[in-house]
């Protein structure tokens, strides 16, 4: 039988084959080469910015397109800022600077007017962690009379800690800041973990031990309430409603909760010169993370990934988890061998997932598949970026401190107006089980903030 194949059909077949060849060979990663790593992450960042509004006509600087929320932007910029430092690549330096500054809010506390009605404690906390990265990496401080990045993180800390609620569940932050938002009666781990980590990092950076005391208070509460269970492979659960005194805990585990707690513990270990208490807790949390979130040493979101149920939020979680693993390996060097192996294996698999899309370097969700699994989006790009760039975490200086290379300008009173009490003006001596002093301060501050919130309703 003679088959007639037209020239047009032959060309079509050739183009299809070439496209397939390009896509399946798009990202060859050499995990020992900075050039290879940074070339790969440059492609991935380009894919992230396909979703960015800030460079479009009429778009909002510092925001990504729907369905991505404000906190996703904070998480994404945290990864891009690390790439700026680790790869020494200033391609997006101006974009990052403009984005971080555009979303500060008029009080420079990361409560911008465009988020006033919907922002939660976790949202503000994620941005606070990102800006703390700017502090520790000596990202160019704002000029023109604006506060430094350090002052902005201190404002985030002061405003978050002012919401500490001792009346329900013995302490802790609620998920939401404002009463009208769904979830106001839920106290979640991520909000409190963000406060814990920010306090730990501020304590290490500034040398002010009051921050460390607050960090210890927050971590003790997470353990006391049962959100963090310090068995040999520790659990970090999601949260609970105050209606049950936080006893009916949502026992779902996510990479970002583990990661943010892990990072906070690593900073506490470092800031206290390797105190055994923090080493023990850190070891248990790391054991839990390794047990729950790695399959064949490849990172995965165990609560949803195998079931195909990961939502937009959950598809971003591995990004901040990867960042925290990298920072932990620096802040607590005894964890380095374990973490480096996990990052290397996961980075290799993540790179292989970045062979999708028409560009040939769109990343996927399930790295175990060793190729793109059909998922794509900002979260997939963010996660691949962070795990791959953390191959370089030991090739650059450790996060700076105020007395060791840090340059950002601070203000311990940032975020607090004249009618509120700054927690750092009181040399708190917070012990486990002794919350009275903090409760009094919190009550004073909450009365002012509540008055402001009531005014906003009219």
Swiss-Prot record:
<keyword id="KW-0732">Signal</keyword>
<dbReference type="InterPro" id="IPR008928">
    <property type="entry name" value="6-hairpin_glycosidase_sf"/>
</dbReference>
<comment type="similarity">
    <text>Belongs to the glycosyl hydrolase 76 family.</text>
</comment>
<dbReference type="GO" id="GO:0008496">
    <property type="term" value="F:mannan endo-1,6-alpha-mannosidase activity"/>
</dbReference>
<keyword id="KW-0449">Lipoprotein</keyword>
<feature type="region of interest" description="Disordered">
    <location>
        <begin position="399"/>
        <end position="418"/>
    </location>
</feature>
<dbReference type="GO" id="GO:0016052">
    <property type="term" value="P:carbohydrate catabolic process"/>
</dbReference>
<dbReference type="GO" id="GO:0005886">
    <property type="term" value="C:plasma membrane"/>
</dbReference>
<keyword id="KW-0378">Hydrolase</keyword>
<feature type="lipid moiety-binding region" description="GPI-anchor amidated glycine">
    <location>
        <position position="437"/>
    </location>
</feature>
<keyword id="KW-1003">Cell membrane</keyword>
<dbReference type="Pfam" id="PF03663">
    <property type="entry name" value="Glyco_hydro_76"/>
</dbReference>
<dbReference type="GO" id="GO:0007124">
    <property type="term" value="P:pseudohyphal growth"/>
</dbReference>
<dbReference type="GO" id="GO:0007117">
    <property type="term" value="P:budding cell bud growth"/>
</dbReference>
<dbReference type="GO" id="GO:0098552">
    <property type="term" value="C:side of membrane"/>
</dbReference>
<feature type="signal peptide">
    <location>
        <begin position="1"/>
        <end position="26"/>
    </location>
</feature>
<keyword id="KW-0325">Glycoprotein</keyword>
<feature type="glycosylation site" description="N-linked (GlcNAc...) asparagine">
    <location>
        <position position="245"/>
    </location>
</feature>
<dbReference type="GO" id="GO:0071555">
    <property type="term" value="P:cell wall organization"/>
</dbReference>
<feature type="glycosylation site" description="N-linked (GlcNAc...) asparagine">
    <location>
        <position position="270"/>
    </location>
</feature>
<feature type="glycosylation site" description="N-linked (GlcNAc...) asparagine">
    <location>
        <position position="208"/>
    </location>
</feature>
<feature type="glycosylation site" description="N-linked (GlcNAc...) asparagine">
    <location>
        <position position="89"/>
    </location>
</feature>
<feature type="glycosylation site" description="N-linked (GlcNAc...) asparagine">
    <location>
        <position position="114"/>
    </location>
</feature>
<dbReference type="GO" id="GO:0009272">
    <property type="term" value="P:fungal-type cell wall biogenesis"/>
</dbReference>
<dbReference type="InterPro" id="IPR005198">
    <property type="entry name" value="Glyco_hydro_76"/>
</dbReference>
<keyword id="KW-0472">Membrane</keyword>
<dbReference type="GO" id="GO:0005783">
    <property type="term" value="C:endoplasmic reticulum"/>
</dbReference>
<keyword id="KW-0326">Glycosidase</keyword>
<feature type="glycosylation site" description="N-linked (GlcNAc...) asparagine">
    <location>
        <position position="417"/>
    </location>
</feature>
<feature type="propeptide" description="Removed in mature form">
    <location>
        <begin position="438"/>
        <end position="458"/>
    </location>
</feature>
<protein>
    <recommendedName>
        <fullName>Mannan endo-1,6-alpha-mannosidase DFG5</fullName>
        <ecNumber>3.2.1.101</ecNumber>
    </recommendedName>
</protein>
<keyword id="KW-0961">Cell wall biogenesis/degradation</keyword>
<feature type="glycosylation site" description="N-linked (GlcNAc...) asparagine">
    <location>
        <position position="231"/>
    </location>
</feature>
<feature type="glycosylation site" description="N-linked (GlcNAc...) asparagine">
    <location>
        <position position="138"/>
    </location>
</feature>
<comment type="function">
    <text>Required for normal synthesis of the cell wall.</text>
</comment>
<feature type="glycosylation site" description="N-linked (GlcNAc...) asparagine">
    <location>
        <position position="273"/>
    </location>
</feature>
<dbReference type="InterPro" id="IPR014480">
    <property type="entry name" value="Mannan-1_6-alpha_mannosidase"/>
</dbReference>
<keyword id="KW-0336">GPI-anchor</keyword>
